[in-house]
Amino acid sequence: MFDVEAHEVIPRDAEAAAGLAGWDRLDEPRADYREQCFYHRLPAGPDGMAGIAVENPALGIRLRIEYSAGTLPNFVQWKNCLSGGYALGLEPTNASVLGRAADIGNGTARKIQPGESVEFDLIFRFEHRLPVRP
């Protein structure tokens, strides 16, 4: 289960578009599951940080990721509910998952000039609470 402000969610491809309504849920493992990837346009707060949290109430665990939206303007969610290969990727990034050539081609590639420096702020908060029992 995700805890996040309302924001735009953009599917990477037709497979993700078919699963858009369930972007915020992790499905049961399936042998025929095909990975889905979503781009999130998360709003930054007054401090320039954007964030998202994912939690499992049954286990009482929660992860919150906050990042500097100015230097990491993209947030990518990779969802794979394949039996035997179950995984979730939560990735603040300054690039897309389409590759460098695609980013250069569409004008979104970022470059660091000679002598330039860039700061990336990332905060990971891991919390454990008492599990919620049905």
Report the location of each language-model feature.
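Active-site pocket scaffolds in enzymes
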Residues: A58-P134
